[in-house]
């Protein structure tokens, strides 16, 4: 077998194996060394390829595709520093447990560490962030070449689904000439492999004595597409309140046991004795709730469908590596405990908080008011992708009486790659992105994918000309003389020109009243800019916190 035949056999087999394990989309950043595999993916009849010239943005775009499709997605780049640009998205996928398949093309071994162009050490370059990594052999036409693909792909597949999900990395060295034989299409196959079903049982006896106590809470974070119906069933039967993070997707059911305003109450000073807490999924957004979890004496049970448990904000009393549905299904027959007073207290607090927020918002003019109006405009067919920093916190406080789904990059919690991830999700869902001006600036080039692929989404841009969240930190008062330059960081950018560059329609709103009258359109892509003031945002949030504190003084 000559070099061309060996190369063709290798890359066509590799592409076919990825398909067999569920890959249906690949994001390719153009380059020379990645030619063999890029052509293999493009030639495969059932793999959709996306082309993005910026590797950093491409990787975040792939994260969005994974979030929207619930399937693993591969990214492919050329050799050299191109691969290093994947790092932020890989870090995010590792902490968020997203099955991102990283494919870095490389120089063959004889061209490494000898000064050859576009050759850096790519072996183990993502070692701190991936669950699996392998440096593939150069195509040589032997059976061992194919065995390496079959064996290593099978090992890697355990990280594509189930409790061990996360990023994997294949480094693929290619020798020139790089063009495979386009005539050998029969080597591209489209069969699928069955993956093992994962389930574990729990020993209810370990926690039965705890579950007999009256004052229990269920706290649910990001569930990452897990089934959640058994959580609601258990909470209903046993009268236990559910403190549901917006990323849990539990809020859309408007269940009477689902509590959404807990962050505002803990911020206002809520401190109730609790006997046990069942923590499910990823850690929640709410800083105040996490602080309470750290100081409470309650018995804490952690349930996560992953072997790498997130103990933040504090190690649990006991943990279970099991899906939420399997866990609560095991508990459903436990003897009932009279918790009517307990659940009714939480329902009363929730009702009073919602009424207070609704009344407050009738006269509010800050960013939160824009966010609340947006939530009320969206329907069950819509999904929100929300940026980190202040937008995700406003969503946490204001998302109730709404059937929308909410998504965010809450692994590393960075503000980079937000636009690209949202656009990736918009391929599969009707997305509205809520983002601040600094996060938008960080990833403006991600808009290119929407432009060249006709991907429609709405962007609600909260423009306070700087880093609004820093106004809530001690630096605002303790370092006032340096605050604006070091933390406020105003840019003075006119984003209308960004919209023009990437073929988005643009509309600016200076008042909440104007936005209230606006009808959102999902025909084409739009940027709706909300001009706000950081000091005004800060003061109006403080007013709302005080109103919630007043409720606690009367109710408890």
Curated annotation (Swiss-Prot):
<dbReference type="InterPro" id="IPR012001">
    <property type="entry name" value="Thiamin_PyroP_enz_TPP-bd_dom"/>
</dbReference>
<comment type="pathway">
    <text>Quinol/quinone metabolism; 1,4-dihydroxy-2-naphthoate biosynthesis; 1,4-dihydroxy-2-naphthoate from chorismate: step 2/7.</text>
</comment>
<keyword id="KW-0808">Transferase</keyword>
<dbReference type="InterPro" id="IPR011766">
    <property type="entry name" value="TPP_enzyme_TPP-bd"/>
</dbReference>
<comment type="subunit">
    <text>Homodimer.</text>
</comment>
<dbReference type="Pfam" id="PF02775">
    <property type="entry name" value="TPP_enzyme_C"/>
</dbReference>
<dbReference type="InterPro" id="IPR029061">
    <property type="entry name" value="THDP-binding"/>
</dbReference>
<comment type="similarity">
    <text>Belongs to the TPP enzyme family. MenD subfamily.</text>
</comment>
<dbReference type="GO" id="GO:0070204">
    <property type="term" value="F:2-succinyl-5-enolpyruvyl-6-hydroxy-3-cyclohexene-1-carboxylic-acid synthase activity"/>
</dbReference>
<dbReference type="GO" id="GO:0030145">
    <property type="term" value="F:manganese ion binding"/>
</dbReference>
<dbReference type="InterPro" id="IPR032264">
    <property type="entry name" value="MenD_middle"/>
</dbReference>
<keyword id="KW-0460">Magnesium</keyword>
<keyword id="KW-0786">Thiamine pyrophosphate</keyword>
<protein>
    <recommendedName>
        <fullName>2-succinyl-5-enolpyruvyl-6-hydroxy-3-cyclohexene-1-carboxylate synthase</fullName>
        <ecNumber>2.2.1.9</ecNumber>
    </recommendedName>
</protein>
<keyword id="KW-0479">Metal-binding</keyword>
<dbReference type="InterPro" id="IPR029035">
    <property type="entry name" value="DHS-like_NAD/FAD-binding_dom"/>
</dbReference>
<dbReference type="Pfam" id="PF16582">
    <property type="entry name" value="TPP_enzyme_M_2"/>
</dbReference>
<dbReference type="Pfam" id="PF02776">
    <property type="entry name" value="TPP_enzyme_N"/>
</dbReference>
<comment type="pathway">
    <text>Quinol/quinone metabolism; menaquinone biosynthesis.</text>
</comment>
<comment type="function">
    <text>Catalyzes the thiamine diphosphate-dependent decarboxylation of 2-oxoglutarate and the subsequent addition of the resulting succinic semialdehyde-thiamine pyrophosphate anion to isochorismate to yield 2-succinyl-5-enolpyruvyl-6-hydroxy-3-cyclohexene-1-carboxylate (SEPHCHC).</text>
</comment>
<dbReference type="GO" id="GO:0030976">
    <property type="term" value="F:thiamine pyrophosphate binding"/>
</dbReference>
<dbReference type="GO" id="GO:0000287">
    <property type="term" value="F:magnesium ion binding"/>
</dbReference>
<keyword id="KW-0474">Menaquinone biosynthesis</keyword>
<keyword id="KW-0464">Manganese</keyword>
<dbReference type="GO" id="GO:0009234">
    <property type="term" value="P:menaquinone biosynthetic process"/>
</dbReference>
<dbReference type="InterPro" id="IPR004433">
    <property type="entry name" value="MenaQ_synth_MenD"/>
</dbReference>
């Amino acid at each position: 077998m000559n070099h061309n035949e060996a190369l063709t056999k290798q890359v066509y087999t590799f592409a076919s194996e990825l398909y067999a394990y569920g890959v249906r989309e690949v994001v390719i950043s153009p380059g020379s060394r990645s030619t063999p595999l890029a052509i293999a993916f493009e030639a495969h009849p059932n793999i959709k390829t996306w082309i993005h010239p910026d590797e950093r943005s491409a990787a975040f775009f792939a994260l969005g595709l994974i979030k929207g499709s619930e399937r693993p997605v591969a990214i492919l780049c050329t050799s050299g520093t191109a691969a290093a640009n994947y790092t932020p998205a890989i870090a995010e996928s590792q902490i968020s447990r997203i099955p991102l398949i990283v494919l870095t093309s490389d120089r063959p071994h004889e061209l490494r560490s000898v000064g050859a162009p576009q050759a850096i050490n790519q072996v183990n370059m993502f070692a701190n962030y991936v669950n699996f990594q392998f440096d593939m052999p150069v195509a040589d036409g032997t059976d061992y070449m194919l065995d390496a693909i079959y064996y290593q792909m099978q090992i890697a597949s355990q990280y594509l689904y189930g409790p061990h999900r996360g990023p994997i990395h294949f480094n693929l060295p290619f020798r020139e000439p790089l063009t495979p034989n386009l005539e050998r299409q029969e080597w591209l196959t489209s069969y699928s492999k069955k993956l093992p079903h994962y389930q574990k049982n729990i020993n209810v006896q370990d926690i039965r004595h705890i579950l007999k106590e009256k004052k229990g809470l269920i706290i649910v974070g990001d569930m990452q597409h897990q089934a959640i119906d058994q959580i609601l069933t258990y909470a209903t039967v046993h009268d236990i309140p559910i403190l549901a993070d917006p990323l849990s997707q539990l809020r859309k059911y408007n269940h009477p046991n689902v509590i959404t305003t807990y962050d505002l109450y803990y911020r206002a000073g809520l401190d109730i004795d609790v006997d046990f807490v069942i923590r499910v999924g990823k850690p929640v957004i709410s800083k105040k709730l996490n602080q309470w979890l750290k100081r409470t004496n309650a018995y804490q049970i952690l349930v996560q469908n992953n072997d790498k448990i997130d103990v933040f904000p504090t190690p649990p009393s006991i943990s279970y590596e099991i899906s939420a549905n399997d866990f609560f299904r095991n508990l459903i027959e436990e003897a009932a405990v009279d918790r009517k007073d307990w659940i009714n207290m939480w329902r009363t607090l929730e009702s009073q908080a919602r009424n207070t927020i609704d009344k407050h918002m009738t006269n509010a003019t800050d960013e939160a008011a824009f966010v609340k109006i947006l939530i009320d405009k969206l329907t069950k067919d819509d999904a929100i992708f929300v940026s980190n920093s202040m937008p995700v916190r406003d969503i946490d406080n204001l998302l109730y009486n709404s059937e929308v789904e909410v998504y965010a990059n809450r692994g590393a919690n960075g503000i980079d790659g937000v636009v690209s991830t949202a656009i990736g999700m918009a391929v599969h869902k009707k997305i509205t992105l809520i983002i601040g001006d600094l996060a938008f600036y960080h990833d403006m080039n991600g808009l290119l994918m929407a432009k060249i692929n006709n991907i429609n989404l709405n962007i609600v841009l909260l423009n306070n000309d700087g880093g609004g969240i820093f106004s809530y930190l001690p630096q605002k008062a303790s370092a006032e003389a340096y605050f604006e330059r070091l933390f406020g960081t105003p840019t003075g950018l006119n984003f209308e020109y960004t919209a023009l560059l990437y073929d988005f329609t643009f509309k600016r709103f200076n008042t909440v009243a104007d936005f209230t009258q606006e009808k959102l359109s999902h025909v084409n892509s739009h940027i709706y800019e909300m001009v706000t003031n950081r000091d005004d945002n800060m003061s109006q949030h403080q007013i709302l916190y005080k109103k919630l504190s007043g409720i606690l003084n009367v109710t408890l």
